Amino acid sequence: MQRIPFPEVGIAYWFNRMAKESLMVAYGATEADAGSDLVSLRTRAEHVIENGQIKGYKITGSKMWISSGAVADLYTVLALAPGGPSWFLVEKGTPGFTQDKHEDKHGIRLSNTAGLSFDEVYVPAANLIGGVEGKGLLQAQAVFGYTRLMVAAFGLGAGEEAIETAIDYANHRIQAGGPLSEKQGYMLKLITPHYIKFEAARAFIDETAKKLDVNNHGQATEGSIGKYYATEAGNKAAEDAIQALGGFGYTKEFAVEKIKRDVKITCIYEGTNEVMEMTIYRGRWQEHLKSRGAYYNNIADEMDAIHAKNPEVGANVIALGLRALATVLEECRLQRLTRHQYITFKLGELIANAEVAAAFCRAIGNGKIVEGCKFDAETLKAMCRVNAKETAYDIASRGAKLVLSAGTADAAALLNATHFVQIEANMHGCIEDSDKVSAKLREIFRK
């Protein structure tokens, strides 16, 4: 609420009440036909006129999937007022306002989730957040940078806990004369790649959080990138942690089964990850167009400068990947391939991977270690190299595949333009670096 332009009297009144009465607040936006797409809003707020002035509003409609919906004391509710989508404060117990039953969910089962119903619920005009109608969607978007980055941290933490449980198990589980954690195939398939992604995600989340601290707003695309990358990584890590524990992982005796159920919601709420892909694509597509293709080439130049200063983090390779991304985006523009929604989704994914890898190189290349990191500088460099190489290879190969699958480009020319052979030539050392990371994981988590 402090990010939204309340009248000063509103801030003092509501914040004092929240503090003194320990009020729990719920966020009421989602509807049956308006999930990640809030434009489809159906809940209405009609004027109540007295002596020619707007005295208040009567809200009618319903909400669903509201966190703390049945237990909150105060609700921020998005409704369509005559002037456009607007947020209103509604107190529990207001006549006509009812809370539905707690949903029986797949995961986060202790978190209350319920629907809300409004039958001509009257609220005074002072309860219009911001004091002006029609600002609701802008107000919601203003906090997406924060809220989606918060969910990114959820996904990262859940994935880490799952993999750390698996490492602990692998350090003690003896197979074929030694612990599972010493088996290269086990580690490089089920454990090590996840921790490399975690550290990349941590670097990006930290970088974006610092920007938010300075700018106090915006970063909607960056928040979407963080949420998409970290929650996809956390969800896949939890799934592989179950596999890493074998039959034990499938039982409720071990935490990984619960983590897998809980982490899945991070790929859904605060905007599904498909909406994140679309949001990322839209934001960076505009940057590509405005810069006439220079946006990712400029970041590539930055990576080359980092490589000149610190050649041990793979920044030169992700620079090739970023230039490949610029080429793929330009081919999509020239051939009008973004008319295919699937391609826009996949572009969003490639963009997210590229920007996270660049942030990782930026942090480690400049000697910045995120607070709370478990790894020394040399291990982080090895992680960064692996991530940069694999991300660049993925961008060049999958980006070319996207263009070729829907367009008419010459395959050989496209592979040359995306620097595919150069990227391939830089893949040397990935297994060796991954083994170094595995050794450090065994050391850190051996109890």
Regions found by a protein language model. Give the residues of each.
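Glycine-rich beta->alpha junctions and the first turn(s) of the following alpha-helix
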Residues: 99-199, 264-269, 273-355
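Extended, hydrophobic alpha-helical segments in both membrane/secreted and soluble proteins
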Residues: 10, 140, 158, 162, ...
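Short Gly/Pro-enriched turn/cap motifs at secondary-structure boundaries
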Residues: 33-36, 65-68, 80, 105-112
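A structural signal for short hydrophobic beta-strand segments in well-ordered beta-sheet cores
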Residues: 43-47
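Glycine-rich phosphate/cofactor-binding loops in nucleotide/flavin-utilizing enzymes
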Residues: 139, 248-315, 403-447
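A short core secondary-structure module
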Residues: 55-99
